[in-house]
From Swiss-Prot:
GO terms for molecular function: rRNA binding; structural constituent of ribosome; transferase activity. PROSITE patterns: RIBOSOMAL_L2 (PS00467). Keywords: Ribonucleoprotein, Ribosomal protein, RNA-binding, rRNA-binding. HAMAP family: Ribosomal_uL2_B (MF_01320_B). Disulfide bonds: none annotated. This is Large ribosomal subunit protein uL2. Residues 28-53, 223-274 are annotated as: Disordered.
Length: 274
């Protein structure tokens, strides 16, 4: 993968930086693993906006991703790497020895023709999935489960990874990219290696329209609104809002703590760093 800067032939291309990946499949995705993905425009069943800044965008199918990796002991071969419009990471179509095909998140360095496997006896190599109880301390992993059998929930986006710091009986200690150190059950599964397409964070869309293609609408500042629309609205001339930053509903924002799940606080060894 490489970054490509464009010549400034127009205002929209002047700041455009694209991620070029010649290894991705050029054709259509694997149809049996596609599902309809209807757009809501941010509206609920009453037609009211429940999520702002959503609307428009290109039609997409949802790719069914195997986040559980439960086909233990059956070797698989990577058929191809594909683009997925629903996530920042690329995905890989793998063919198992029993004839079944599944999509997985493509780890860094994975390419067509590579062999992967899952299960407690899987070799220690990138792309293989196994319980963290069976992984060496210090391993870099992604697609990490929080509960055994629930499916991966942590480190699924492009370039993400988690490091196994220690193993102590029933739990392993993980260091997340945010700096948080937390404990997870040792029987939870993870995939070795880090997620590929790390250059995704270095791209530049170049123009506002590129965000509209992705279904993202503009964000209007509260201080530019009227008092009826936002707590920061109104005033004569340009103002700073006149109070600490809040959401349109008066909730503190920009740094206010939002974590409410005290039940799982006991698993957090060290809180994340800013």
């Amino acid at each position: 993968m490489a970054l490509q800067k464009c010549k400034p032939t127009s205002a929209g291309r002047r700041h455009l930086v694209k991620v070029v990946n010649s290894d991705l499949h050029k054709g259509k995705p694997y149809a049996p693993l596609l599902e309809k993905n209807s757009k809501s425009g941010g509206r609920n069943n009453n037609g009211r906006i429940t999520v702002r800044h959503i609307g428009g965008g290109h039609k997409q199918h949802y790719r069914l991703i195997d986040f559980k990796r439960t086909k233990d002991g059956i070797p698989a071969t990577v058929e191809r790497l594909e683009y997925d419009p629903n996530r920042s990471a690329n995905i890989a179509l793998v063919l198992y020895a029993d004839g079944e095909r599944r999509y997985i998140i493509a780890p860094k360095g994975l390419k067509a023709g590579d062999a992967i496997q899952s299960g407690v006896d899987a070799p220690i190599k990138p792309g293989n999935a196994l319980p963290m109880r069976n992984m060496p301390v210090g391993s870099t992993v992604h697609n990490v489960e929080l509960k055994p059998g629930k499916g991966a929930q942590i480190a699924r986006s492009a370039g993400a990874y988690v490091q196994i710091l220690a193993r102590d009986g029933q739990y392993v200690t993980l260091r997340l990219r945010s700096g948080e150190v937390r404990k997870v059950e040792a029987d939870c599964r993870a995939t070795l290696g880090e997620v590929g397409n790390a250059e995704h964070m270095l791209r530049s869309l170049g123009k506002a329209g590129a965000n509209r293609w992705r279904g993202i609408r503009p964000t209007v500042r509260g201080v530019a609104m009227n008092p009826v629309d936002h707590p920061h609205g109104g005033g004569e001339g340009r103002t700073s809002g006149g109070r600490h930053p809040v959401s349109p509903w008066g909730k503190p924002t920009k740094g206010a703590k939002t974590r409410k799940n005290k039940r799982t606080d006991k698993f957090i060894v060290r809180r994340r760093t800013k």
